[in-house]
């Protein structure tokens, strides 16, 4: 059964919030915090809670580290380059710390949940005052207070799985789109993946808590809700309340909004889930289903618990049930022991599925995973060649993928000004497709209808038909 933090512990942290607030109130100017979340949407969501706690402690926010009184990096551990970026950023803060001895530097998240990384940071980066893992984020007020009042340096990396803290304050990045975590952790232990080690075992939030949060966001005017979890398809096993049932209940909430979710695992994706999406009023017609590889031999080595036949059957059912379903995926190139024949299996699967887009990565060795100990005879040069070959295949598919929408009138959530220089507005359709269209700034946050006229490799463009709210 999932454990939740008891109210007494949260009240203790609230007392620390008030203590830090009192200290900050004595300053001549409001202290500023710089918070940077690296990596996935779950980290971004955690960063919003961190900002919520900091705001209650009396901090304002700045995008510039040079102006900050507190700098906090919320880190990612999925790939080595993400860790290298963090170390580079922390190293660059050394001069700031020398100029301002009162500057507080904190590093949290998945990267420092790894013991060897946490110890390296403690020994090699003395400018870092607070190091905290993924399971103790709610105790940040206490760690900051102890630094301010006692100049205490903190390393808090508990090995036990975290518990769920309900009711933490949130400062959301958007007034239109909101993320709602529905579960934490992962039980799959794919051999290449560090997530179960840094996020712990699967823990689902109670259905009534999720439903209440989503209702509140819709009532507050949010137009898109993104449901988050390392494996949302395995939600609710503790409560006999599966993910398809949760989606069905959320879809009943009155209002004009869109529901989307990530990330899914093919072994837990079911016809029931696909049917729920197809029959819904609000759920996105976009299915992100990471395949990782098109070789059954390598899928077994990855401990993925499905084969390509099962995966293709799910895709074909989704195409049958969900109108013009948008399909995206994740693919790893160069897994230890992968041969060129294995790689060609991935190429053929990509051609058969015809993804709208694919997030493709060269294998990144993660210390502590089973794959890290596997022989890896593939040269970096070959991995690079395979990677580029796969990108070429996907790009050729993606160039024409969105042509199926030409002539359709689609509803789009207007999110802002487009990236091009032609003054178009932009947003996403129910399929998760980027849609650029002629419009005005006052449409931001509203649903509009657009007639699609042109398909591009990564977006579509069209003509505004109507503003719907």
Give short role names for the model-derived ranges.
Residues 1-234, 272, 309-320, 344, ...:
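Proteins enriched for Cys/Gly/acidic motifs involved in redox and nucleic-acid/cofactor modification
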Residues 104-107, 114-116, 218-340, 351:
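Conserved SAM/AdoMet-binding glycine-rich loop
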Residues 173-176, 186-188, 283, 293, ...:
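Short flexible coil/turn linkers enriched for glycine and charged/polar residues
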């Amino acid at each position: 059964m999932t454990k939740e933090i008891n109210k007494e512990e949260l009240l203790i942290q609230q007392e620390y919030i008030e203590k830090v607030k009192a200290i900050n109130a004595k300053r001549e100017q409001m202290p500023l915090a710089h918070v940077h979340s690296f990596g996935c949407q779950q980290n971004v969501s955690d960063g919003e809670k961190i900002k919520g706690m900091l705001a209650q402690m009396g901090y304002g926010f700045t995008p510039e580290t040079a102006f900050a009184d507190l700098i906090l990096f919320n880190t990612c551990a999925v790939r080595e380059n993400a860790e290298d970026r963090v170390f580079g950023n922390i190293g660059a803060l050394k001069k700031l710390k020398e100029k301002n001895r009162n500057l507080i530097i904190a590093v949290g998240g998945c990267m420092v949940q790894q013991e060897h990384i946490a110890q390296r940071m403690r020994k090699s980066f003395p400018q870092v005052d607070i190091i905290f893992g993924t399971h103790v984020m709610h105790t940040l007020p206490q760690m900051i207070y102890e630094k301010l009042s006692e100049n205490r340096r903190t390393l808090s990396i508990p090995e036990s799985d975290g518990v769920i803290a309900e009711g933490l304050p949130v400062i959301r990045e958007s007034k239109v789109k909101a993320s709602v975590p529905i579960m934490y952790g992962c039980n799959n232990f794919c051999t290449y993946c560090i997530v179960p080690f840094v996020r712990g075992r699967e823990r689902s939030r109670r259905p009534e808590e999720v439903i209440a949060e989503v209702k509140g966001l819709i009532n507050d005017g949010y137009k898109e809700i993104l449901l988050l979890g390392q494996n949302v398809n395995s939600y609710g096993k503790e409560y006999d309340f599966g993910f398809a049932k949760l989606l069905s209940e959320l879809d009943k909430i009155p209002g004009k909004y869109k529901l989307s979710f990530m990330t899914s695992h093919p072994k837990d994706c079911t016809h029931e889930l696909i049917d729920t999406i197809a029959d819904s009023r609000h759920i996105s017609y976009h299915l992100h289903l990471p395949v990782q590889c098109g070789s059954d031999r390598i899928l077994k080595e990855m401990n993925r618990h499905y084969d390509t036949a099962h995966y293709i059957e799910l895709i074909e059912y989704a195409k049958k049930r969900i109108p013009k379903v948008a399909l995206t995926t994740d693919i790893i190139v160069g897994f230890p022991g992968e041969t060129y024949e294995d790689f060609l299996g991935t190429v053929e699967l990509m051609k058969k599925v015809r993804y709208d887009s694919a997030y493709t990565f060269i294998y990144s060795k993660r210390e502590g995973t089973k794959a890290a100990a596997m022989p890896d005879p593939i040269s970096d040069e070959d991995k690079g060649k395979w990677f580029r070959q796969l990108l070429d295949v996907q790009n050729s598919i993606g160039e024409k993928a969105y042509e199926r929408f030409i002539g359709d009138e689609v509803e789009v959530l207007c999110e802002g000004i487009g990236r091009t220089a032609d003054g178009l507005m932009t947003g996403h359709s129910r399929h998760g497709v980027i849609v650029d269209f002629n419009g005005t700034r006052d449409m931001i946050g509203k649903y509009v209808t657009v007639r699609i006229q042109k398909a591009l490799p990564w977006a579509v463009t069209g003509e505004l038909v109507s503003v719907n709210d």
